[in-house]
Design a protein with these regions (language model features):
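Sec-dependent N-terminal signal peptides
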Residues: 2-13
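Cysteine-dependent hydrolase recognition
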Residues: 15-417
Length: 417
């Protein structure tokens, strides 16, 4: 640890921060508007430079948490990889942990999972104590773009689109029976959790589905849907680090969405949250920026993304997805980071008192590869899914009962009774 970092760390002892930010010094000026805005909201913030090894950083977080007030951890910077071999590049990054994988390796995943989860676990019990988010900026320009999006998002007036979910379903490919079971479970989860006053707009990659766009129009439809305002944009399907699943097209097979499409996105304020329930789309340790990273740092991309760093599995995806929706729409924590933290904690628990979870467990025993270890599968999915974005982001909830409140429509203002 360098002398500057040591002095700053010792100074924390006298403070009682609720938010710790790990930020390279080169990014501080780009972060300044965010810091000022959050402090005006009442947050006590400590900002420290990154360290070379995750174990060192974890010890620093534990020291700051001794105040007993720490709730949020914001990591500013990408994960170092082979491309960041030079010291000047590595000092702009924040390291991550690598934990052994035992379950998803049966589906072809790597032997380790890239994960920021240990930073959230202050008492080493395997459950997150902090709400953690990583803003994967490679340079001050990208961080400034993210900060501008955050400020626009939180300052925008309520809109009709705040009650809209846009959902894209890819092809299953696990076998006809498993695909049918997974699709039925996903629809049941949506019915049980999404408020009835929400509009759910669907696009399907299955050409026989009534939600399928005209032939050859799937990719443009998805880009337009993602560019539209809404509470969240959710993708359910296969993925790779830089793209979603590939589907038949006039020129062969092309991705439903890729990093090449990101510059053309025009997400209208307030930008939606992107939830990518898929393999690899959040692989922030890959040699190049993954799809979720590109979406988040783009000026006109989604406000944040929840995505996985490794191969995901149907059961783990379904449980974590269910708990995300339940936390968001039933518990309604104020911030995005606390939505994910609550969902992670519930995913790790057996939740026998919840009527949906035993049903999902029963279905999983019929489709998961033997030997079945549902608890271990849930742990791995909690480890690999991350929030790429600001954990302090205040979500745009619309009150279920709004009296004489003016809500802005997409093109006009309407009065909600």
């Amino acid at each position: 640890m360098n002398c500057t970092a040591l002095v700053l760390l010792l100074a924390v002892t006298a403070a009682a921060p609720d938010t710790l930010v790990i930020c390279p010094s080169e990014f501080r000026s780009a972060l300044a508007p965010w810091e000022e805005y959050r402090r005006r909201q009442g947050h006590e913030i400590v900002i420290l430079p990154p360290l070379d090894r995750p174990e060192q950083l974890q010890a620093t977080i534990a020291h700051v948490a001794q105040s007993g007030t720490l709730k949020h951890l914001v990591l500013i910077g990408d994960v170092p990889n082979a491309a960041a071999m030079y010291a000047a590049q590595r000092q702009l990054t924040v390291p991550t942990h690598y934990r052994p994988a035992n379950i998803n390796t049966r589906w072809g995943s790597e032997p380790t999972i890239a994960t920021d989860m240990p930073y959230a676990d202050l008492d080493s019990d395997g459950t997150p104590d902090l709400a953690v988010g990583r803003i994967p900026a490679d340079n001050p320009h990208e961080l400034a773009a993210v900060v501008r999006k955050i400020l626009r998002y939180e300052r925008a007036p309520p809109r009709n689109s705040d009650r809209r979910l846009n959902v894209v379903s890819g092809a299953g490919g696990f076998g006809a029976l498993t695909d049918m079971i997974v699709e039925a479970a996903a629809r049941q989860v949506m019915r049980q959790t999404v408020p009835k006053d929400f509009e759910v707009r669907r696009i399907s990659a299955n050409p026989t589905s009534p939600d399928s766009p005209p032939p050859g129009q799937l990719r443009p439809y998805i880009c337009r849907q993602l560019s539209a305002s809404g509470f969240a944009w959710i993708y359910l399907g296969h993925g790779r680090p830089t793209e979603l699943d590939r589907v038949p097209a006039a020129t062969g097979r092309e991705p439903m969405l890729s990093v090449d499409d990101v510059p053309g996105l025009r997400c209208t304020a307030p930008c939606p949250l992107a939830v990518l329930v898929a393999c690899y789309t959040g692989a922030f340790d890959a040699d190049r920026d993954c799809l979720a990273e590109e979406l988040v740092v783009a000026e006109n991309g989604p406000i944040a993304a929840v995505a996985a760093t490794r191969v995901t599995m149907p059961y783990g995806n379904t449980v974590l997805g269910y708990e995300l929706l339940r936390a968001c729409f039933h518990d309604r924590p104020a911030t995005l980071g606390d939505v994910l933290r609550l969902a992670q904690s519930r995913t790790l628990a057996s939740a026998a008192d919840d009527p949906m979870r035993p049903s999902l467990d029963g279905l999983a025993r019929g489709i998961s590869p033997p030997p079945v270890d549902l608890a271990a599968e849930r742990r791995e999915h909690v480890a690999m899914y991350h929030l790429l974005g600001d954990p302090l982001l205040r979500l745009r909830y619309v009150a279920e009962e709004v009296a004489d409140a003016s809500i802005q429509a997409d093109e006009e203002t309407v009065t909600v009774k």
